Amino acid sequence: MAVNIYDLAHDLDKGIRETPEFISLQDAYREVNENADAKAKFERFRDVQVTIQEKQMTGQEIDDETVDVAQQVAQEVQENELIVKLMEKEQAMSTIINDLNRIIMTPLQDLYNVAND
């Protein structure tokens, strides 16, 4: 019986959305968005992250001003308990995603390990 890998992927999507970790992440994200101060700080934090990533991807140097802004924004974010909670929930979700990725990659790793033996 052939397996439709895309059906499995959609089942995984649904399963992820039903995990306590994802539900907690949704709740934490909603709390940040419902608080104007936390929302503004979080959006600024994300904007700075994107700016740094874009510079890295295009080979641009990250100047001192960008570093200073990033440090200031990071400090502000660390002082906001709603954002700290959100980041903790993101980390828990990231652990799950990394575990899933490891599992998904196992067939390829097994293939190449067998081929190298």
Swiss-Prot record:
Q: What Pfam families does the database record attribute to this sequence?
A: Com_YlbF
Report the coiled-coil segments: none
Q: What SUPFAM superfamilies does this protein's entry cite? A: YheA/YmcA-like
Q: Which InterPro entries match?
A: Com_YlbF, YheA/YmcA-like_dom_sf
Q: Which Gene3D superfamilies match?
A: YheA/YmcA-like
Q: Which family does it belong to?
A: Belongs to the UPF0342 family.
Spell out the protein name for this chain.
UPF0342 protein lmo2223
Organism of provenance: Listeria monocytogenes serovar 1/2a (strain ATCC BAA-679 / EGD-e)
